[in-house]
Amino acid sequence: PAAEHFSIVDADGNVIPWQKSADGRLVFFAKGVPAKGYKTFSIVHGGEQGENTVKVENKTIENKFFTVKFDKDMNIASLIHKATGRAVAPEGEVLNKIYAYDDRPFNHEAWDIKVYFDQKYTEINDVSAVDVTESGPVRTVIKVTRKFLSSTIDQSFIFYADLPRIDVDYTVDWKEKKILLKADFPVDVNATEATYD
């Protein structure tokens, strides 16, 4: 739709919050789509996008699920799960710390990672830009740009209004050789099984 005076509604007539993404796409939370099924949504004239419920203040981001505080290097210094009041990171640890490791394989360039790879490393803390690239009723996106030697690392932290999760999307323009990159998220979870990607 060319004009932004429209609404998205589901088959039951419920109005669904929406917003434009940083790259101009229409974004909304498709609630209630059955597994292996579908649900129809329609664009109708009139109405508004909805209100932003994700708060950004200084280096603190808050929605109804989490309170997140960033440190001076834009690493996550504190992530509190509001429903339980529990800190996700272990005491004294930060989430999202990026490391560059010396990568000197014996035989093969790709995936020949030796057990001692973590003995020589550099923390990547050179933040060159922090921008709020999206702020709307569906999500808020904080983009952090880091520099390392000749490379650039863009991290987009995505905080949703109605989803109990935080996504971190990486875009890396990597120009280095024999250097391994790692993002560290030490979480304080005591479980015999975990599902993650």
Please place each PLM-identified region on the residue numbering.
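Catalytic and substrate-binding regions of extracellular carbohydrate-active enzymes
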Residues: 1-172, 183
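Extended, low-complexity, turn-rich repeat/linker tracts enriched in Gly/Pro/Ser/Thr and Asp/Glu
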Residues: 174-179
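Polysaccharide-binding surfaces and accessory modules of carbohydrate-active proteins
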Residues: 185-197
